[in-house]
Amino acid sequence: MDEFIKMLKKVKPNVDFENEEALVDDGLLESLDIISIISEIADQYGVHIPSDEIIPDNLNSAEALYELVEDLK
């Protein structure tokens, strides 16, 4: 999970990914940020996130996003 957080901070360095639980709902991640994160996940983890999984519930916290990636491996 630490490496995953580092990857997220590379995309959006000023966000507290360890503690934030409403990244999308609070507007901390915008559409271009989400595209960048999905691209990084594909590059680093070899995981393709289907468009029907790109929903706030899966993106509102680093933990939720990490669980999604693990489920898709």
Name each region found by the language model.
Residues D33:
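Two-component histidine kinase catalytic core, primarily the HATPase_c
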Residues M1-D16, E67-K73:
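Thiotemplate assembly-line natural product biosynthesis machinery
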Residues V47-L72:
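C-terminal structural segments of small proteins and small subunits
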